[in-house]
Amino acid sequence: MGFGDFDTICQKAALPLCSLVGPASSISGATGIIPNCYARNIELANTIIFEGAASFVHIIALAMTVIMILHIRSKFTAVGRKEIITFFYIYMLLTMCSLVIDAGVVPPRSGPFPYFVAVQNGLTSALCTSLLVNGFVGFQLYEDGTALSVWLLRLTSTAMFAISFVISLLTFKSWGGLSPTNTVGMFVVLYILNAICIAVYLIMQLLLVMNTLEDRWPLGHIAFGLLVFICGQVLLYAFSDTICENVQHYLDGLFFTTICNLLAVMMVYKFWDYITKEDLEFSVGIKPNTWEVKEFLPEEDRRATVYQDTNSEYAGSMYHHRASAYNNHNY
């Protein structure tokens, strides 16, 4: 296996792009690398669903992402609120795209399939880039929530999406000097650059916690998120075929990787939620009746208030009847 080849990777893991890379078959003439083992299809309501277990996890991930977005939106004055919510919007788009591809809504060998896989690759790069830029927010190099901060995140994420999408599509379509057998460019963008983005984000958050925070609990969130992410990658690229064979093709490494990726993203949210503070005067809490009065004032205390105990409980208020000269009528 040479640098940038997907032969070994695709033999172990049933990735969507594997059917679009590799040498052409001498029999059918179609490109693609067949994995050693992949999860069996299931039939539901006369519809064949690919990767049923992984598709179910994608649906759970969408629900969890909506919940996290709602919690973030409720913290109006938290640092980096607009920036981190962009990260979760990109993750939601990536999950939706992965669900469409993995479930077979767009089947392999169909015309739109290369474009959907290219979009998936682009969203993956955009997600990692968004995570990297979010790592700068805590250092207050520029004010968060401003046009500079938000558009810097959007433009860099969009740029990486475009680069990854174009390189992937050129590779799949054998355009621009790239081909399914010349995958070095796509490998560098998808694996090398994304790994660098994640590594830089982790280092920056460690520096942020160690240098600016007295509480060390956020380090646990970082450690757990990194652990489950690494476990997911190992299960996918090293043991996917072994898992698949031992469970009679009901599951493969993609199922466990999807779960681990979801947990890692949840730890990103948990870390941000833990280290951010907000002004209680302007915040909107999730729990209702935060300032609910638990008991009434005693009778003697109530009589001592600005409202006197007369026939009208508003008699002692500051409002007084006054005459109006409008059309010589009194109001």
UniProtKB/Swiss-Prot annotation:
GO MF annotation list: unfolded protein binding
Keywords: Cell wall biogenesis/degradation, Endoplasmic reticulum, Membrane, Protein transport, Transmembrane, Transmembrane helix, Transport
Main location (coarse class): endoplasmic reticulum
Magnesium is among the record's keywords: no
Compartmental location: Endoplasmic reticulum membrane
Membrane topology: Multi-pass membrane protein
Protein name: Chitin synthase export chaperone
